[in-house]
UniProtKB/Swiss-Prot annotation:
Keyword Zinc-finger listed: no
TM spans (from-to): none
Lineage: Bacteria, Bacillati, Actinomycetota, Actinomycetes, Kitasatosporales
Organism per entry: Streptomyces griseus
E.C. number(s) listed in UniProt: 2.4.2.27
Gene: strH
Name of the protein this chain belongs to: dTDP-dihydrostreptose--streptidine-6-phosphate dihydrostreptosyltransferase
Chemical reaction(s) catalysed: dTDP-L-dihydrostreptose + streptidine 6-phosphate = O-(1->4)-alpha-L-dihydrostreptosyl-streptidine 6-phosphate + dTDP + H(+)
Length: 384
């Protein structure tokens, strides 16, 4: 069945199995203070990413109702963030949490459409924020320009969603669903999806999945963007690489659906649609309209096996991270921890026979060949 209008969410949607419930009341009070004439766009980041925020703010339209949610920032970081952002609304939390918990907090507490944009997603076409939100027509659960495949799901670095449709989704599938990561079996010590909380797929989910996902075997969905295969040697790899690893003698012992992916599959099973006003494949994008290298917040923490699994993508995250940090550290008010990291990064680069000038030349060439205007002052200040 196709929904034509969402059922209004009850005030204070109570879901005791979701995390961060102690923040619901202060968060709703915070939401009440946001401008009501424009949909909010939430940008979540944690400690250690002010150099990325510094660049993100260059691409943030003045009129955009941009709202920051921050996890675990030091007092010095929070003060510098506020100086840089010019007083944009911020909701601070002391807890160290991941994006999946934030997705749940947002969908549980908002009763109007909102957007999500990663702090390392630099949107050049400022009208794309409006176009993304305009895609939320009746019968649409999520809208965005980046697409997982082969099932065309919107990718989390830049999307808009309508939380009011969740009751309709749950009624159609016969049970609850959240925008968290999901798996058929409990996670092992690997802590898939960067240590995020992983929820278990229940019978009503399996019945709904059967309507929209092809299976290669029992509890083994066909490879799909946003789906992670956990191998028998503990490695976590993209499902698109499955056949390569099977030919090498590995077995898939568990699959994990990344955050918001499973939620969108349940929306499709309920008869709702995913809207795309543009169609970038995947989440790593270098294009005139936006740049999202992806993985900036965690590439340096990856194990060698994880680096090997994404070797064609992660180096660009390293380029962007290093160059943004170098430029940020020119400020006089940078916290000492950022200068320390800059010193360590420079030493690591020397050991790898790489220098900043080389990274700068490579990133400039990558951006230029992708149609990005490298003379744009926002990029020129980083590229030199």
């Amino acid at each position: 069945m196709v929904m034509t209008s969402p059922t209004r969410k009850p005030s204070g949607d109570v879901r005791p199995d979701e995390p961060l419930h102690h923040l619901d009341q202060p968060f709703r009070e915070f939401l009440d203070g946001l401008p009501a004439d424009r949909p909010p766009w939430f940008c979540f980041f944690s400690s250690g990413l002010l150099h990325v925020l510094h660049h993100f703010l260059r691409f943030t339209p003045e009129r955009l109702n941009c709202v920051f949610i921050c996890s675990g920032l030091s007092k010095e970081e929070a003060e510098l963030r506020d100086r840089m952002s010019g007083g944009r609304p911020v909701f601070d939390m002391t807890e160290q949490v991941g994006s999946h918990e934030i997705f749940e907090l947002l969908v549980r507490n908002l009763d109007r459409p909102f957007g999500i944009v990663d702090v390392d997603c630099f949107v050049t076409e400022t009208d794309w924020f409006e176009r993304c939100m305009d895609g939320l027509e009746p019968g649409v659960a999520v809208s965005g320009p980046l697409s997982y495949g082969p099932i065309p799901l919107a990718a989390p670095p830049f999307l808009a969603l309508d939380p009011r449709v969740r009751p309709d989704i749950e009624r159609a599938i016969g049970g609850t669903v959240t925008p968290a990561a999901y798996s058929y079996t409990a996670p092992g010590p690997e802590k898939e999806i960067d240590g995020a909380m992983v929820r278990l797929i229940e019978p009503h989910h399996e019945r709904a999945l059967a309507r929209v996902v092809a299976l290669e075997g029992p509890r083994l969905p066909f490879p799909q963007g946003g789906l992670v295969d956990v191998l028998d040697d503990g490695r976590e790899v993209r499902s698109h690489e499955r056949y390569h690893h099977l030919q090498n003698g590995n077995e898939v012992i568990r699959v994990v659906f990344d955050g918001l992916m499973f939620y969108q599959l349940m929306a499709l099973a309920a008869g709702l649609r995913i809207a795309h006003f543009h169609s970038f494949p995947g989440t790593k994008v270098f294009a005139p309209q936006l740049v999202h290298a992806g993985g900036i917040s965690y590439w340096h923490r990856l194990r060698p096996s994880e680096i090997a699994a994404g070797i064609n993508e992660l180096p660009w995250a390293a380029h962007v991270d290093a160059l943004l940090l170098e430029e940020f550290n020119r400020r006089a008010d940078v916290p000492a921890s950022y200068r320390t990291r800059g010193t360590r990064l420079a030493a690591n680069l020397r050991r790898s026979m790489v220098d900043m000038a080389g990274l700068r030349d490579e990133l400039r060439a990558k951006l230029d060949s992708s149609g990005v205007d490298v003379t744009d002052p926002r990029w020129a200040v980083v590229l030199g």
